[in-house]
A protein has these predicted regions:
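An N-cap/entry alpha-helix motif that binds or orients negatively charged groups
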Residues: 1-72, 182-198
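Conserved, mostly hydrophobic/aromatic
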Residues: 25, 82, 103, 161
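Phosphate/diphosphate-binding glycine-rich loops and adjacent basic-rich segments that engage nucleotide
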Residues: 157-198
Length: 198
């Protein structure tokens, strides 16, 4: 199942961002688009991407070319994969499932987030074994051991140890929108969701 949106309006990442801003409830858009604190790190990351320069190589034979990459003794179709993303299904029903299918179609890894909307077992099954598992340190030791056992039992071979969030960060947009876990629906959120039914 392909996502039914007007692809002809998406010519760039900025176009896709604007479409998401229009279609998604503000709370959901801000969860995806926002960052912690004053968002300077996110802004600086985007500036760093803008500074990447590609060097063209001309007058060489490009008849046989490939983006295949070998990493951790596995050959992948592209030199990148899907990063761990929590709560994907907030943005679109079964988004985790669609990402797993795309991973299979493109032979790329998908990293199952500890905050995924879909269980780590289901993501592994849906990805035909292309899934990696994200592990945050700092959780209760019994909880972490249980997660690792579950990941091992269903076949995960790669664990991505995530150390960038030693404590939960303050996210201003989420605070302004009243987003917290567990989520409690406010009148403002209800109206926002009702006016963005997609």
């Amino acid at each position: 199942n392909k996502i039914p949106y007007p692809r002809h309006k998406n010519f760039s990442i900025d176009d896709a961002r604007e479409l998401a801003k229009w279609r998604l409830p503000r709370l959901v858009f801000d969860i995806v688009d926002g960052a912690s604190g004053n968002e300077f790190l996110s802004i600086n990351n985007n500036k760093a991407y803008e500074n990447i320069k590609l060097e063209p190589r001309v007058l060489i034979n490009v008849e046989e070319r490939s983006l295949k990459t070998k990493f951790l003794d596995t050959e992948y179709g592209l030199p990148f994969g899907f990063a761990p993303m929590g709560m994907c299904n907030l943005t679109w029903p079964n988004a985790d499932t669609m990402l797993a299918k795309e991973a299979i179609d493109n032979n790329i890894p998908i990293c199952s987030s500890m905050a995924a909307s879909t269980s780590l077992e289901k993501i592994y099954e849906l990805s035909n074994g292309l899934a990696w598992f994200q592990l945050y340190i700092g959780q209760d030791e019994d909880f972490v051991v249980d997660l690792l056992n579950r990941a091992q039992d269903c076949g995960y071979k790669t664990i991505i140890l995530t150390v960038d969030v030693p404590i939960l960060a303050r996210r201003s947009r989420d605070n302004r929108n009243g987003f917290d876990i567990p989520f409690r629906m406010s009148i403002k959120n209800f109206i926002d969701f009702a006016t963005h039914p997609n």
